[in-house]
Amino acid sequence: MLGHIKLMTVAPEIEAIRKVVALHEPNILVVDTTDEVHVDRFDGEIQRQNMVIGALKEMAQKHNIIVFAVHHVNKVSAAGNTISLHSLKGSTNIVQKADKVLMVKGKRDERARIICSEKSRDEGRFEMTCAFDFETMTFKELL
């Protein structure tokens, strides 16, 4: 049913992601999580993040695709369900480099989620409440 979706189930090198994008020419690339992408020769976490995000942005521009780079929130914010841009695990470096930041808020054991735009260079912010359907892999807006 979801044959149009291709999955890599191992933490890839950034070069492996480049090859997959060139081979399959996707419209959308989801990297979950940016922490798991391996890069060569880096000095510290900020430089590693710069290399990963820089490579993903380059692929987006070169191949005219949408890239979703997943970055998790810290445990304290997740446990208290008080998620904001300051809740991101580690450095806010990723937020600074992103064109848009979407946050998915909600409790792990509930189907309803709030999807909100926390940062956007081109458009205004939005927020909507959705339910996720695991069979169709889609969100349905709850009014």
Predicted regions and their residues:
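Glycine-rich, phosphate-binding/catalytic loops in enzymes
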Residues: 46-48, 134
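Short glycine-enriched, charge-decorated loop/helix-capping segments at active-site entrances
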Residues: 43-45, 84-85
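Conserved inter-motif catalytic segment of the P-loop NTP-binding fold
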Residues: 1-44, 51, 108-109
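Phosphate-binding/switch region of NTP-binding enzymes
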Residues: 54-143
